[in-house]
Amino acid sequence: MGSTLKHLLLLLLVLIRHVDSAAIVKSLPGLEGRLPFELETGYIGIGEEEDIQLFYYFIKSENNPKEDPLLLWLDGGPGCSSLGGLLFENGPVALKSAVYNGSNPSLFSTTYSWTKMANIIYLDQPVGSGFSYSRTPIGKSSDTSEVKRIHEFLQKWLSKHPQFFSNPFYVTGDSYSGMIVPALVQEISKGNYICCKHLINLQGYVLGNPITYAEHEKNYRIPFSHGMSLISDELYESLKRNCKGNYENVDPRNTKCVRLVEEYHKCTDKINTQHILIPDCDKKGHGITSPDCYYYLYFLIECWANNERVREALHVTKGTKGQWQRCNWTIPYDNNIISSVPYHMDNSINGYRSLIYSGDHDITMPFQATQAWIKSLNYSIVDDWRPWMINDQIAGYTRTYSNKMTFATVKGGGHTAEYLPNESSIMFQRWISGQPL
């Protein structure tokens, strides 16, 4: 009898270990009343033993969830939680910037959410970011391993939500996800050819200020800085003449170039590289004490996500996560995709649509760098450079290519959509519905 009971308990433990959790969230601390949208959170187990547990937030479209596109949103980093994308960039709720007094930070409903026209899965990846965790040590993650894990996540998530198999599917994200998203699109596309009875209805992808070939793209920071009047004409001409376009991995024997690059950094070190017009108040922690700093919101999101009531509302499994961080920079990680340009080329050949947008006040990933790799794909222009408008005002500039790739700048935007979420939302809404920007 004792042996039978022991075996039953072991079987129960195995079943519990392999059950993926999902729960509907009716309300959130900091927001009054019931949620005006449908939110589901949960974990999907990854790997043979499903030791990796990837946490997600799923928000149904507020328009027509049965037919509207399904998006997967990935934040950058690597190691940044997609809760940041939800609360800062394109979700239906956002954090109020107010002095933290020890109580839970407040939320408000937004008018710019992408969920007004799409279903969105916000995924915490790689494992170790956000509320995702592993039951056992997994060693170092990498770009390529994460691509396979995210693909597995999608297959399992859709098998549990089969009503979304037929929805047009897009992979979306910004910043470092520029390395992951194109490779993931290729992985899904290949998977559709070799498997299964239910195919992912892959249509394309969306990327904002994407890192694509980091070591090469950094060289565009100096031309960008000159164009924005952060350095003088004389310094710029000397840099071009003596560095020959290579400003990052400078040969130490080229002493003239070394000295000139040092002069450049003296001019720009106190500039906020994410958005050159916003005070760089986060590096010394000034934002922690004053909501006058834009990045005070980064402090507030950590206060909110580490509140026990919030974790209970989100159905985070107790004991699986210590301190929640907006970005976990300590995850062991191998950046083993050197350039995602070949993936863009492959995805273009396979006919997938893409929207690539750039906030034009971002030094981290200058729009000139993005234009350069798009040009290197060597596709013809079908709709040449022109302004795109909102309420008869120029919101940015756009160009469309024969590979179904649309490039757009967001005038006054920064490294992510959070700086101008309304403009970014209108741009996305037009593109996803097939309208010209």
Curated annotation (Swiss-Prot):
Its EC number is 2.3.1.-. GO terms for molecular function: acyltransferase activity; serine-type carboxypeptidase activity. GO terms for cellular component: extracellular region. GO terms for biological process: proteolysis. Its main location: secreted. Expressed in senescent leaves. Keywords: Acyltransferase, Disulfide bond, Glycoprotein, Secreted, Signal, Transferase. Pfam families: Peptidase_S10. Coiled coil: none annotated. Residues 1-21 form the signal peptide. The active site is at S175, D362, H415. Disulfide bonds join C80-C327, C243-C257, C281-C293. Disruption phenotype: Lack of sinapoylated anthocyanins. Glycans are attached at N101, N328, N378, N422. It is found in: Secreted. Involved in the biosynthesis of sinapoylated anthocyanins. Belongs to the peptidase S10 family. In cv. Pna-10, this protein SCP10 and the adjacent SCP8 are not present due to a natural 13-kb deletion. This is Serine carboxypeptidase-like 10.
